[in-house]
Amino acid sequence: MIRVTRLLEVKDLAISFKTYGGEVQAIRGVNFHLDKGETLAIVGESGSGKSVTSQAIMKLIPMPPGYFKRGEILFEGKDLVPLSEKEMQNVRGKEIGMIFQDPMTSLNPTMKVGKQITEVLFKHEKISKEAAKKRAVELLELVGIPMPEKRVNQFPHEFSGGMRQRVVIAMALAANPKLLIADEPTTALDVTIQAQILELMKDLQKKIDTSIIFITHDLGVVANVADRVAVMYAGQIVETGTVDEIFYDPRHPYTWGLLASMPTLESSGEEELTAIPGTPPDLTNPPKGDAFALRSSYAMKIDFEQEPPMFKVSDTHYVKSWLLHPDAPKVEPPEAVKAKMRKLANTFEKPVLVREVE
């Protein structure tokens, strides 16, 4: 029997920001977990709360204006929320590494990349100057930078965007963190370089056996890198499941919308891509009931009155939608989504259990 060890567990996390316009409820009761060696992708539109969630784990949210309303962030069983800034400095980099969105601004332009990598080592390990430089060269080689002995002495402006992102990944891995948070690491890169970085991250995970939280708005990216997916909308997780469950048995209308709006290689080029109507809600005054109801063509009366609970579809698949209630009418997802579901119909065993969970 394989023993799965839980690395991270986020319980009922709620984070708000105080602004002149009122309290912005950026995260509203988020729950998820991550096991050792696993990759979890958190997906959603801009403003859904993905980056705030990742920054909360690292405790990088500026306070004020941000503050934790409630919840726990358990890393190896220890709650990070009450830790002081000094205590968190021993966690950041050493236990949890982070790759930020834009490699162009993540590096100090006046400092050689080798020195920026060795700074991480000096902070978290007792290591000599020579050993640190050797380790920096090894890390650059690990992330696929050619001639690392030479390039370790170069400045960021001497690297392309893709190579800079590789340097940022090397910095994040320098102290061998148990968890790596990648916050849209391919957003600022062109498509071919994106593919290389994604391939690199898959390769690195096999080599160093780290757990990864991958933040993205691109479902196409998710299919390549993740084991499980959490779909976020308006500060809440509305659906979570394995990659196959999210792509080939999605149950939430928002997930349907994301999948239907995604182009595929099978597209003839003649059909129009589906767009999700409307805009995300204003979280200074979150809507009553289901936050997605105003944008959903499947919304029922109860969606505007009561917030839906989580419904369990399988041991790994949970959905926050009244459509899964036994009394709800049976509805069909958009044709573009049904086509994807048919594609894997023979290999994917559909769960039959649907019940409400606490």
UniProtKB/Swiss-Prot annotation:
Keywords: ATP-binding, Cell membrane, Competence, Membrane, Nucleotide-binding, Peptide transport, Protein transport, Sporulation, Translocase, Transport. Its main location: membrane. The keyword Translocase applies. It holds the Pfam family ABC_tran. Residues 8-259 form the ABC transporter domain. It is an enzyme of class 7 (translocase). GO terms for biological process: establishment of competence for transformation; peptide transport; protein transport; sporulation resulting in formation of a cellular spore; transmembrane transport. Induction: Positively regulated by TnrA under nitrogen-limited conditions. Belongs to the ABC transporter superfamily. This is Oligopeptide transport ATP-binding protein OppD. It comes from Bacillus subtilis (strain 168). The gene is oppD.
